[in-house]
A protein has these predicted regions:
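Solvent-exposed polar/charged
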Residues: 60-63, 88, 114, 118, ...
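Transmembrane helix-loop junction
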Residues: 60, 98, 149, 172, ...
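Hydrophobic helical membrane-anchoring modules
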Residues: 2-7, 182-327
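Structured catalytic core of nucleotide-sugar glycosyltransferases
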Residues: 1-132
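Acceptor/aglycone-binding surface of glycosyltransferases and processive sugar-polymer synthases
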Residues: 73-89, 94, 103-181, 202-214, ...
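Amphipathic alpha-helical interaction elements
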Residues: 35, 171-175, 226-229
Length: 327
C-alpha cells in the first residue's frame, strides 16, 4: 500500500486477461498521453484471472511507478463484470475505460479530456471502421439491430466500452446495483451529456483476441436481457401468432402431402419449428432477466478480489459503493 494522496484528475482503467504481450506497452503509452494532458493521473489494471505471466509483469510495473495500481480477481468474472468493477474502483474526477490491446487508441485521451472539460459528462469512442472478419461484423450488426429494435433506450452504432466518464456518472451507475452491468447501455440510459469521437479501430498490437463469436453473442444476449424490458411482453403476443400459424400448418399438411408430395410437408414443419425456436429464444431472454433479478436480490459483488497492489491506504479494500445493500 502507498500513503493516502490527493484525488487524481484522471483514472485510466484497463481490464486484462492474458495480455502479457501488451500490458507494459499500453501502460507506457497511456502514461505518456496522460502526463501530457492531465493534471494528475492513475492507471488501474484489473486482471481477470490471467495465466500467461501478465500478473508478474503487472507487479513489476507497480514497483516501477506508484501511479500504476493493480486489482487481481480471484477468478475470471467475464467481459461485463470485471471491467465495470474496475471503473467503480477508480477515484479520478474523470475515468477512462479502455482495452489493453491498443484497439482503443491511447492517442485519443487528450481529445476525451478536451470534450470533458468542455462540458460533456460522457465521451464515447465511436468505431468508424475496423479490420474484422465479415462474420464478426455480421454478429455485431445483428446484436446492434436487436438492441435498437427491442432495447429501452437509443443505441449508438459503433460505440464500445472505450470512453471517458465523469465522476458523477460513475457514482450514479455504481448505485444501480446491476448484477450483469451492460455499462455502455447504462450510460446511454442514464441521460448524461454525451459527446462522440469517431475513430478508425486498429488491429490488436499483439496476442490473440479473447472476443470470439461465442463471447460476443453471450455479451449481446446479456446486454439485451438487461436493457430490453419490453421483451417481457413480446412472447405473449408472439405465442398467439405462432400457435395460430402452427394450427394452420397442421391442418394444411395432409392436403399438401396428397397434392404436392412430402416436400411441402417438410417445409411446413421446418417453418413451424423455426417459429417455435424464435419463441424459445425470447423465453430464454426472459429467463435471463429473471436470473438477473435473482442475482440482484442476493447482493453479490461484481468481483471478489484476490489482491490489490499500489493502492493508497484509504483505498485498501473494495470501495463501499460497489457492495450496495438495498433497504
Amino acid at each position: 500500500m502507498t500513503p493516502a494522496h490527493d484525488t487524481p484528475e484522471l483514472s485510466v482503467v484497463i481490464p486484462c486477461f492474458n495480455e502479457a504481450q501488451n500490458v507494459a506497452a499500453i501502460c507506457a503509452a497511456v502514461t505518456a498521453e496522460a502526463t501530457g494532458h492531465a493534471e494528475s493521473h492513475e492507471i488501474i489494471l484489473i486482471d481477470n484471472g490471467s495465466t500467461d505471466g501478465t500478473r508478474t509483469i503487472m507487479r513489476n510495473l507497480c514497483a516501477a511507478d506508484p501511479r500504476i495500481r493493480v486489482i487481481l480477481n480471484n477468478r475470471n468474472y467475464g467481459q461485463m463484470r470485471s471491467p465495470t468493477y474496475g471503473l467503480y474502483q477508480a477515484e479520478g474526477r474523470a475515468v477512462i475505460g479502455m482495452c489493453a490491446d491498443f484497439q482503443d487508441p491511447p492517442a485519443l485521451i487528450g481529445e476525451f479530456l478536451r470534450k470533458w472539460r468542455g462540458g460533456a459528462q460522457v465521451v464515447l469512442g465511436q468505431r468508424r471502421s475496423e479490420k474484422a472478419s465479415p462474420l464478426l461484423r455480421a454478429v455485431r450488426h445483428i446484436g446492434y439491430g436487436f438492441l435498437a429494435r427491442f432495447g429501452d433506450y437509443p443505441v449508438i452504432p459503433g460505440a464500445t466500452g472505450f470512453g471517458l466518464f465523469d465522476r458523477e456518472v460513475v457514482d450514479t451507475l455504481a448505485a444501480w446495483n446491476e448484477p450483469e452491468p451492460f455499462f455502455r447501455g447504462m450510460v446511454v440510459e442514464s441521460g448524461f451529456r454525451l459527446a462522440l469521437i469517431p475513430f478508425d479501430r486498429p488491429e490488436r498490437a499483439a496476442g490473440e483476441s479473447k472476443n470470439g463469436i461465442a463471447a460476443l453473442a453471450s455479451f449481446a444476449l446479456s446486454g439485451l436481457a438487461g436493457s430490453a424490458k419490453s421483451l417481457l411482453r413480446l412472447p405473449l403476443f408472439l405465442s398467439l401468432y405462432v400457435g395460430l400459424l402452427a394450427l394452420a400448418l397442421l391442418i394444411a399438411a395432409p392436403v399438401a402431402l396428397i397434392v404436392d408430395g412430402p416436400v411441402w410437408v417438410l417445409l411446413a414443419l421446418a417453418l413451424c419449428f423455426g417459429l417455435f425456436a424464435m419463441l424459445l429464444l425470447f423465453l430464454g431472454l426472459i429467463g435471463e432477466q429473471v436470473r438477473m433479478l435473482a442475482e440482484r436480490s442476493r447482493n453479490v459483488p461484481l468481483v471478489i478480489e484476490q489482491e490489490r497492489i499500489n493502492f493508497p491506504v484509504d483505498r485498501a479494500g473494495p470501495a463501499a459503493r460497489t457492495l450496495i445493500r438495498r433497504p
